[in-house]
UniProtKB/Swiss-Prot annotation:
This is Low molecular weight protein-tyrosine-phosphatase PtpA. Gene3D superfamilies: 3.40.50.2300. The gene is ptpA. GO terms for molecular function: protein tyrosine phosphatase activity. It catalyses: O-phospho-L-tyrosyl-[protein] + H2O = L-tyrosyl-[protein] + phosphate. Phosphorylations at Tyr-122 and Tyr-123 are essential for phosphatase activity.
Amino acid sequence: MVDVAFVCLGNICRSPMAEAIMRQRLKDRNIQDIKVHSRGTGSWNLGEPPHEGTQKILNKHNIPFDGMISELFEATDDFDYIVAMDQSNVDNIKSINPNLKGQLFKLLEFSNMEESDVPDPYYTNNFEGVYDMVLSSCDNLIDYIVKDANLKEG
């Protein structure tokens, strides 16, 4: 079993959306050896459910997110793969834990997009655009993890 964590600022918009989408794609592909989490680098939303905009877009696409609440990325977290939404989160993660054991990426490294950062829909209100960015990256991320961790699909 490998652990993957998506990380954004408050863990109410981008990273919980990515967690829910990734779980759905893993279910669709019948991959059971990847456990998905999400975390935030800021503590002001701890214990809160996903943002209303994230909930609406996930509901629109019939992707479950039951029981998800905001959690903080901590130095003691031990994930195999850490996927940040933007460079600021990469910097925050490295500051929180300068001795990371897991592999650290930005999500859009797994997309064909020119952008390198997933914009925060908390400020842009573009939840649909973020959904498209996350969805376009998840299968490539899954392919990478399956190969890197020598997992079986199906």
